[in-house]
Regions:
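A short beta-sheet element
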Residues: 105-163, 168, 180-184
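Non-catalytic DNA-recognition/assembly elements of restriction-modification systems
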Residues: 35-67, 190, 194-202, 208-219
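Short helix-capping and inter-helix turn/linker motifs at the boundaries of alpha-helical repeat units
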Residues: 33, 130, 175-179
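A structural connector/turn signal
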Residues: 98, 104-105, 130, 174
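Low-complexity, Lys/Gly-biased intrinsically disordered segments
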Residues: 2-16, 22, 26, 52-91, ...
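Flexible, glycine/threonine-enriched loop-and-boundary segments that flank and lead into catalytic domains
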Residues: 5, 27-46, 91-97, 103, ...
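Feature representing long, continuous alpha-helical segments
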Residues: 152, 156, 165, 174, ...
Length: 219
């Protein structure tokens, strides 16, 4: 959608925005302003022609958050903190309301259907698909994806080994490493047609269900 509007001249491209393109040698490159970088470290050779290779920032509002003062949050509102999310699985361990938590810092507002990504200590792999509206710590980024990317597919991508390697490599800070906004927007995402996204989601969820069943039988 955004690329089409740029082509039509209805909006202008951000000069600092990162864009992936294919060079005359048929290889992929990343352009950020006047800087052009090779993406030879990423393996795109086996991708079907119907898939697109893009930057995460081209498909979602990465880093654009709405800050809300806790004084303006209702007691019944869901307040999501990092401790509420299980690492690697993204399972919400508990839902705590504002009246119970009495959180005192500014929060990010999120909506049902958004992908909630923890930029703090990305190696913990905490990514949630919101099933209701709420508010979260500022260490969590609510992401709104364009309609040609299913939220659940985006969530699994953000939890994938490829994205984890990238996030850990780009994180800054020793004790409290974080993935910066600029690097988050530059992350490479491969986008299949929606029908294929649905097939991938079903396959992943089936695998998770089988693993859960095995773990239950071994307990």
């Amino acid at each position: 959608e955004k690329e089409e509007l740029i082509k039509q001249g209805k909006i202008k491209r951000d000069k600092k925005e990162s864009v992936i393109f294919r060079g005359e040698d048929n290889s992929y490159y990343l352009r950020t302003g006047e800087l052009v970088e090779s993406l030879e470290d990423w393996d795109f050779e086996e991708l079907p022609d119907s898939w697109r290779v893009c930057c995460l920032g081209e498909f979602c509002d990465y880093g654009n958050c709405t800050n809300i003062d806790t004084a303006d949050i209702a007691d019944s509102a869901w307040i999501l903190d990092l401790e509420d999310i299980e690492k690697d699985s993204g399972v919400v361990l508990q839902k705590v309301r504002q009246g119970e938590r009495n959180a005192g810092s500014t929060k990010h507002r999120f909506h049902k259907g958004q992908v909630l990504y923890s930029k703090l200590r990305p190696y913990l792999n905490k990514v949630v698909l919101a099933d209701e509206d709420g508010y979260c710590t500022s260490e969590i980024l609510p992401l709104e994806f364009e309609r040609n990317i299913l939220p659940q597919y985006a969530r699994y991508f953000l939890m994938s080994p490829a994205f984890l390697r990238y996030a850990n490599k780009c994180s800054y800070g020793v004790k409290m490493p974080r993935l910066g906004t600029a690097d988050g927007k530059k992350a490479i995402i491969s986008v299949p047609p929606v029908k294929e996204q649905k097939r991938i989601i079903m396959a992943i969820e089936l695998a998770f269900a089988q693993l859960a069943s095995i773990a239950e039988n071994l307990a």
